[in-house]
A protein has these predicted regions:
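Short, well-ordered beta-strand elements
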Residues: 339-340, 346-355
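Short, conserved catalytic-motif segment at the N-terminal edge
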Residues: 2-56, 76, 92-101, 366-367, ...
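Acidic helix-start/capping segments at beta-turn-to-alpha-helix junctions
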Residues: 84-91
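Short glycine-rich, acidic/polar surface loops and turns
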Residues: 298, 310, 326, 333-341
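Active-site SXXK
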Residues: 4-10, 29, 55-83, 170-175, ...
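Short clusters of small/polar residues that mark proteolytic maturation junctions
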Residues: 36-38, 82, 228-229, 353
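Short, surface-exposed loop or secondary-structure junction motifs
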Residues: 93-323
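Generic C-terminus detector
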Residues: 353-379
């Protein structure tokens, strides 16, 4: 292994609009690369460190999907189940016609598969009246997710793709199927068995002091400004967002990814059975309409990829021109963090960033880091 080119690229990132970056790579359960560059606070010149915390944003979705798949594995959830089996509020849904604006009863049944696959017809409108009313009443996960069912869907379930609150709804399904709060279930099957301490939904006072600053990038002027907002997906004190609610260190999240990629943790704990990991690696959830919607949403990000049971899933390396094998899966987040699970090579990659609006990151940085990792492993 030779990661010289990866090192060079990492050291160039502060010049490319990335104030701080941390990258952890594991192979066959062992860390083979872990580097931190830049400043956790640019104004104070505080160097980034492995103890830094950051909001994972949509990398949370990977953990939510894995938690749901654990329940699928145990027979407590079926992917084909109607969501209404767990959440009665989703029994009678409405659909708004895109062309006419007419609102009618949904003809198709919303299923758990549609939640996994972002084909539920939902959106990311956090200001919807029903959601705001539930927040004002002090609602938690179940109450706020129930309110999400009030807004008409953008299309019939299963007929297209739209990145949305589907995984927040999936977290509520996990709560019902497990009989536990979402955070309690994650603690039971992931945090405690994997010995993860610096991860969760609500940071302690000590942890708040260790958060790296989040910045906003202007893609036209290429200027960075301090991002004054918090995690806007933390809707209420008792709300646990399955779509974007977790914070973590790169080290803690990397241990989670390693348990999936390697088939077990370094302490021997098995999070998911090999056949479940194989199912995630091989499942493409997209219907023809879903595939059209996916590529319409992200025209240049899914060549050779589709959307499956845990975010993106690699289907065809001859189209993606990637060294990653078929079956690699993972996702990214609003502040440009990125994760990869490669069960074939037992490889995991966790890239931690804190930059909002960094378009370059999704289209260029992520795939480039991925290819440099594989090049380093093979050199």
């Amino acid at each position: 292994m030779n990661f010289k080119e990866l090192d060079q690229f990492m050291n160039q990132l502060p010049e490319r609009g990335v104030p701080a970056c941390e990258l952890a790579v594991t192979l066959e359960g062992k860390t083979v690369y872990h580097e931190v560059v830049g400043y956790a606070n640019v104004a104070e010149k505080r160097p980034a460190a492995r103890s830094d915390l950051r909001w994972l944003f949509s990398c949370t979705k990977v953990m939510t999907c894995i938690a749901a798949m654990r329940l699928v594995e145990e027979g407590k959830i079926a992917i084909s189940d109607p969501v209404s089996r767990y959440l009665p509020e989703y029994t009678h849904l409405k659909v708004k016609n895109k062309e006419t604006g007419e609102i009618t009863d949904a003809r198709e049944t919303l299923t758990v598969a549609h939640l996994f696959g972002m084909m539920g017809g939902m959106d990311y409108d956090l200001k919807a009246p029903g959601i705001q009313e539930a927040i004002a009443k002090g609602g938690g996960t179940r109450e706020i997710v129930a309110a999400m069912a009030e807004k008409p869907l953008h299309f019939e379930p299963g007929t297209s793709f739209r990145y949305s609150l589907c995984h927040d709804v999936l977290a509520a399904v996990v709560e019902v199927a497990s009989g536990m709060r979402f955070s309690e279930y994650l603690d039971k099957i992931i945090f405690t068995p994997l010995e993860l301490t610096d991860i969760g939904f609500v940071p302690t006072a000590e942890q708040e002091k260790r958060f790296a600053e989040t910045y906003k990038y202007d893609n036209i002027t290429r200027e960075l400004t301090l991002y004054s907002g918090k995690n806007e997906y933390w809707l209420a004190p008792e709300y646990e967002s399955g779509g974007a609610g977790l914070f973590s260190t790169v080290t803690a999240y990397s241990k989670f990814l390693t348990a999936l990629a390697n088939g077990k943790a370094d302490n021997g704990y098995v999070l998911l059975k090999p056949e479940t990991i194989r199912m995630i690696s091989e499942t493409d959830l997209m219907t023809p309409g879903g595939r059209d919607g996916l590529h319409e949403s992200w025209p240049s990000r899914f060549f050779g990829y589709s959307w499956g049971l845990c975010g993106r899933v690699h289907l065809d390396p001859t189209i993606s021109f990637s060294a990653a094998p078929k079956g690699e899966f993972g996702w990214d987040g609003a502040a440009c963090s990125y994760c990869l699970i490669d069960p074939v090579n037992r490889l995991s990659v966790m890239l931690g960033l804190n930059v909002r609006g960094y378009t370059y990151g999704y289209h260029m940085l992520h795939p480039h880091v991925r290819e440099l990792v594989y090049a380093g492993l093979n050199s």
